[in-house]
Amino acid sequence: MITNYKYKPTVYFILAFAITWINGFIIAVQSHQGVDKNIIFLLLAYMGPYIAALIMMFVFCDKDFRADFRKRIYNLRLIKKNYIPFTLFFLPITMVISILISIVFGQPSEQLRFAEEFKIFNGEVILSMIILVLVPLLEELGWRGYGVDSLASKFNLFRTSMIFGVLWGVWHLPAFFMKNSYQSSLWGQHPLFAVNFFVGIIPLAIIMNYLYYRNRRSIFLIALFHILVNYSSELFEANQISKCIFTLLLSVVAVIIVIRNKSFFFQDKMIEV
């Protein structure tokens, strides 16, 4: 762990948001003009957190910081074995439970079917599949490569998770303006479903940061968990009622984790500088 580096969270998040939002809103405007998605703008938008992290590392950090970053990507020995089952199975099991609860309350049982296609971008199956895998990896190289640690150098883990959860949610804003995107479809169904998207990120941030710091800041583990977040949401024909229940269950689990690990979440700082 890098203990003698002064993190610059404000600079980092301004860079990450600027890169993502500039390119993201360009795509949003083009999508309403009938222009095909420009893969360069799309990649730059999703790579905002990672590009910002690279800028911070090469402008403000030394070789030891960069070596630590590389180690946290590739070194699987950072991962504690007892966290692997939770990482792999928690999200899909929670989604199935959410669907079952919704069925009890009258929602269609067809939700338990495997989805015929992924719905990140309607009608663009291959692009959606790539995004489901590639984007979580690119995000986590930035968020856990620099962003979350920069917040954890200033705040305890609970405040870090709450602040990051809000920032992470707002970071997705351009997607809500892209025609045929999953996020834009939420508004069309009901504003509550769009609100649920943002609310659900908060407990997710708590759970992910807990895993991250319990596993010696392994970027690999959190990237895998993030990929499973996306796949669990798209694997079944789950409707938005089930996804609201999913958010509720995530919140319950996040609260339990915080209560059972109070000293871990409320110690002064996760990273001393």
Where are these regions (language model features)?
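Specific transmembrane helices
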Residues: 2-136, 164, 196, 234-273
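Alpha-helical transmembrane segments and their helix-entry boundary regions
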Residues: 9-13, 83-84, 146, 160-161, ...
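Transmembrane alpha-helix/helix-exit interface in multi-pass inner-membrane proteins
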Residues: 95-103, 140, 159-181
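Hydrophobic/aromatic residues in alpha-helical transmembrane segments
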Residues: 97, 147, 204-208
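Membrane-interface helix/loop boundary segments of multi-pass membrane proteins
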Residues: 138-170, 213-218
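Membrane-interface interhelical connector segments
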Residues: 142-149, 178-189
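Functionally important transmembrane alpha-helices
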Residues: 186-251
